Amino acid sequence: MIEFDRVTKRYADGSPAVADVSFTVPSHKTVVLVGSSGSGKTTLLRMVNRMVDPTSGRVLIDDVDVTTMDPVRLRRSIGYVLQSGGLLPHRTVVENIAIVPRLNGATRPDARERALTMLDTVGLDRDLASRFPAQLSGGQQQRVGVARALASDPNILLMDEPFGAVDPIVRRSLQHELRELQRTLGKTILFVTHDIDEALALADEIIIVAAHGVIAQRGTPTEILTRPANAFVAEFVGVDRPERRLRLADAAGVEVVTDASGRPIGTLER
Ligand SMILES: Nc1ncnc2c1ncn2[C@@H]1O[C@H](COP(=O)(O)OP(=O)(O)OP(=O)(O)O)[C@@H](O)[C@H]1O
């Protein structure tokens, strides 16, 4: 479990990026921080692996304050996926994925074998192993980023807008694959996005973040959609948007789901 206990972060120039924030990420669950730009999501995420240290308050992993841990070892024990992929451009795919296992002491052949297995895990062909990142599509690069983060079998995965830079169709399939992967791997995932639909698709629990990391609401996707705590959340989630107000229509004996404007979006299965 990851626990944020009254955490504040003040950068050098003044107003707090994050002010007195407390929440937990239960083990084996996916918690998604969603909020507008500059609300402090990345700051919160980076406090888990000590890329940022809190000005006050504590971040605990399984009851241990992360500031008592060696930052380098801590970072090697936590998977981290960034929007840009963060792959080393002059290393091949397999080398990129093998980095952390190597740093953790695996022999070169073992680390390579592990990296190839990770390619299978994230649904990439082993033929891509010797390519360089620039020779991959955006979606493939993000899969490699996920493979690299998982390569040392960390308990915790931090994901900062990992699918933000790919087109909507690839993004959907990456989200779907992450959910499938999570079903079997059961990692503790803290995921940051500004896209509420991505949060609804991925989260066991969503935390809607307002300015300065203030938590506007925490709940399951269903709770957030059906019982927004206040006007800010309702507006952010877009509870009144036509695609959130689904209706049923009958089309020659088949129940068709339409949005509020009557546009068909699917059929109902019972
Ligand atoms: N290294 C830094 N030095 C000074 N201010 C910073 C630094 N990093 C972030 N900030 C400020 O802290 C606030 C929160 O930034 P943060 O990146 O955590 O927000 P975010 O919610 O992740 O935003 P985005 O969705 O745009 O990535 C912003 O006002 C930002 O300008």
Describe these PLM feature segments.
Residues 65-79, 103, 108-109:
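ABC ATPase NBD coupling module
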Residues 109-127:
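Conserved ABC ATPase "signature" region
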